[in-house]
UniProtKB/Swiss-Prot annotation:
It holds the Pfam family GTP_EFTU_D2. GO terms for molecular function: GTP binding; GTPase activity; translation elongation factor activity. It is found in: Cytoplasm. Residues 9-288 form the tr-type G domain. GTP binds at residues 18-25, 82-86, 136-139. This is Elongation factor G. One of its GO terms (cellular component) is cytoplasm. Keywords: Cytoplasm, Elongation factor, GTP-binding, Nucleotide-binding, Protein biosynthesis. The keyword Manganese does not apply. Belongs to the TRAFAC class translation factor GTPase superfamily. Classic translation factor GTPase family. EF-G/EF-2 subfamily.
Length: 694
């Protein structure tokens, strides 16, 4: 099918998101199978899933990178991004949600809402992504569809509305009643569930289905209060409402984020996947429904609103970089306005660099098809971009527009790394550079005192997998040290400094004079460096050098050498020498000045605090809470259901190394826990002194 056959209203850009192990990749595999993209179904537990194309993913049975693929269904073109459910890969979820128009949240019918489902749901709220839900694994022991719906309401605050009523559950799960069409769908075992037949609603479910349908209609009546005809029918003659009318109101409610319809099925047993595909097309938004996208015009500094039109100016967002052994560097983009053609010259407005597109590729996991152009609403990949990284805006050379960036959280864990042989030193540097371009939460730095290379990331699994990739993709063998906490430094009061850098040693001297004011920035806002220089006391051409020096100075703090965060620096005054001043002199002076100001601004050390959720049998609850308290944890809350208790707490990461092992021994292996970065907080004075001594 060529793209020309698809209007914008027939495109769906969707993500599939869930907690690890809810069956998300299996659901995507079935979608690919039924939509005719794969001729053989990939099974995750056999290591053959199409979307999990990296070797590490196939070995570990988890999804690490968001694979993008395109399928066709009911006359629509669906671009699907499969996202990882493990907390160490939150940036993958964050960046895919940023470019999606809608999402399918997959839940496990036994567990309902799990901790990672809450994280992903919060991220989707942040970007206002409309969602429908699929309660998967209805064939499992203990499956409870209505329990899962209830947990969505309680834990996520979702307006979850069942649109199915399951027929049987666990091994007796044979199908579902569609509350909209009022038909019972029975999946035929001889076709492995690929086909089904419609029958009458079984007698023992008729009353329950009538109640559920009425609740569904009443909820829909509140979605669009201007639609009086629909409200009237709901109140006076609900049986006269057509399926078409229900779908219209349902679509409006989903797109406006007022409702989250919930379907059920078992992807593994092929039940309910085609029904899910139908409603992806019927209810989730097209790029047109998501409306205009906001950006900033760089020439005027004003906010602009871009219509989703293929004739408009080009505006695209790079949301992922991949290094491919055959093609080289691939940049994934989403086009919000205009058309991008193969061979065209464009501007990376974030970096003010010109780029040229050498190839355009439509991706299916790791297979690819060449394309001549991508237009508004498309998600695709480009080859040939040299400077663009995640979050950069690509636009026409004469239309300087910047779109909202993708925020990357600060890494929380550090490891020292060195090549096993001296000959690998350069290869290691190349590998680290390529990997940090792909993943904004992976940072590479050098410890100034020891000269060691330090890699930082979101957790041990994150760094483990990157190390695996170095060995496999870049053929680099490296030794890594023990994981360490990634501490940060910040300041707690306002201060200033006046610094002169003067050198006279025969020949041309060096001269720079810089005055700074520094103040604490809002937590989580990062560092800001601004110039308030007026009247040319420092010439305009030297200001970027001062800023660069200040930024480099902030890379290592004054207490223990950890990077400074949340500091606002203003360059307020200075002077220069006609002959002796240079960019280098001002850069060195900027770095010295910011260090001097920080020493006077009561610096403190910050540590990453993790949100920890533990699910434990109730008889071990006391031990688990006692253990978290000993680790300087702050208990946020606990709840119980079916002899299991869930405890949530905030605990410093430094106290959590080896936690899984001790939790297993505390609870005889019956408890599970998840941990995700929450925020950075000041360390207690006694611990700060110990860190500084080290």
């Amino acid at each position: 099918m060529s793209d020309q056959e698809f209007g914008l209203d027939a495109i769906r850009n969707i993500g599939i998101m869930a907690h690890i192990d809810a069956g998300k990749t299996t659901t995507t595999e079935r979608i690919l199978f039924y939509a005719g993209r794969t001729h053989k179904i990939g099974e995750v537990h056999e290591g053959g899933a199409t979307m999990d194309w990296m070797e590490q993913e196939q070995e570990r049975g988890i999804t690490i990178t968001s694979a993008a693929t395109t399928v066709f269904w009911l006359g629509a073109k669906i671009n699907i991004i499969d996202t990882p459910g493990h907390v160490d890969f939150t940036i993958e979820v964050e960046r895919s949600l940023r470019v999606l128009d809608g999402a399918v949240a997959v839940f496990d019918a036994v567990s309902g809402v799990e901790p990672q489902s809450e994280t992903v749901w919060r991220q989707a709220n942040k970007y206002g992504v409309p969602r429908i839900a699929f309660v998967n694994k209805m064939d499992r022991m203990g499956a409870n569809y209505f329990g899962a719906v209830e947990s969505m309401r309680e834990k996520l605050g979702a307006n979850a509305i069942p649109v199915h009523c399951p027929i049987g559950s666990e091994s007796q799960f044979v199908g579902m009643v569609d509350l909209i069409s009022q038909k019972a769908l029975y999946f035929l075992e001889e076709t492995l569930g690929a086909k089904w037949e419609e029958r009458k609603i079984p007698e023992d479910l008729q009353e329950q289905c009538a109640t559920l349908r009425m609740q569904l209609l009443e909820e829909l009546a509140t979605v669009d209060e201007s639609n009086e005809a629909f409200m009237e029918k709901v109140l006076e003659n609900p049986d006269s409402i057509t399926e078409e009318e229900i779908h219209t109101v349902m679509r409006k409610g989903v797109i406006e984020g007022k409702i989250n319809p919930v379907l059920c099925g078992s992807a593994f047993k092929n039940k309910g996947v085609q029904q899910l595909l139908d409603v992806i097309v019927k209810w989730l938004p097209s790029p047109l429904d998501r409306g205009n996208v906001r950006g900033i015009n760089l020439k005027t500094g004003e906010e602009v609103s871009l219509k989703p039109s293929k004739d408009g100016p080009l505006a695209a967002l790079a949301f992922k970089i991949m290094t491919d052994p055959y093609v080289g560097r691939i940049t994934f983009i989403r086009i919000y306005s205009g058309t991008l053609k193969k061979g065209s010259a464009i501007l990376n407005s974030t970096k003010d660099k010109k780029e040229r597109i050498s190839r355009l590729l439509e991706m299916h996991a790791n297979e690819r098809t060449d394309r001549d152009e991508f237009t508004v609403g498309d998600i695709g990949a480009c080859v040939g971009l040299k400077f663009s990284v995640t979050g950069d805006t690509l636009c026409d050379e004469n239309q300087e527009i910047v779109l909202e960036r993708i925020e990357a959280p600060e890494p929380v864990i550090d490891m020292a790394i060195e090549p096993k042989s001296k000959g690998d030193r350069e290869k290691l540097a190349q590998a680290l550079s390529a990997l940090s371009e792909e993943d904004p939460t992976f940072r590479v730095s050098t410890n100034e005192e020891t000269g060691q290379t330090i890699i930082s990331g979101m957790g041990e699994l994150h760094l483990d997998i990157l190390r695996d990739r170095m060995i496999r993709e870049f053929r680099v063998e490296a030794n890594v040290g023990k994981p360490q906490v990634s501490y940060k430094e910040t300041i707690t009061k306002t201060s200033n400094s006046e610094t002169k850098y003067v050198k006279q040693s025969g020949g041309r001297g060096q001269y720079a004079h810089v005055c700074l004011e520094i103040e604490p920035n809002e937590p989580g806002k990062g560092n800001e460096v601004v110039s308030k220089i007026v009247g040319g006391v420092i010439p305009k051409e030297y200001i970027p050098a001062v800023i660069k020096g200040v930024e480099e100075g902030l890379n290592s703090g004054v207490l223990a050498g950890y990077g400074l965060v949340d500091v606002k620096v203003s360059i307020v005054f200075g002077s220069y020498h006609e002959v002796d001043s240079s960019e280098m002199a001002f850069k060195i002076c900027g770095s010295m000045a910011v260090k001097e100001a920080c020493r006077k601004a009561l610096p403190v050390i910050l540590e990453p605090i993790m949100k920890v959720t533990v699910i434990t049998p109730e008889d071990h609850l006391g031990d688990v809470i006692g253990d978290l308290n000993r680790r300087r944890g702050k208990i946020l809350g606990q709840e119980s259901s079916r002899n299991m208790a869930q405890v949530s707490a905030e605990v410093p990461l430094s106290e959590m190394f080896g936690y899984m092992t001790s939790l297993r021994s505390l609870t005889s292996g019956r408890a599970t826990s998840t941990m995700e970065p929450a925020f950075f907080a000041k360390v207690p004075q006694k611990i700060q002194e110990e860190i500084v001594k080290k």
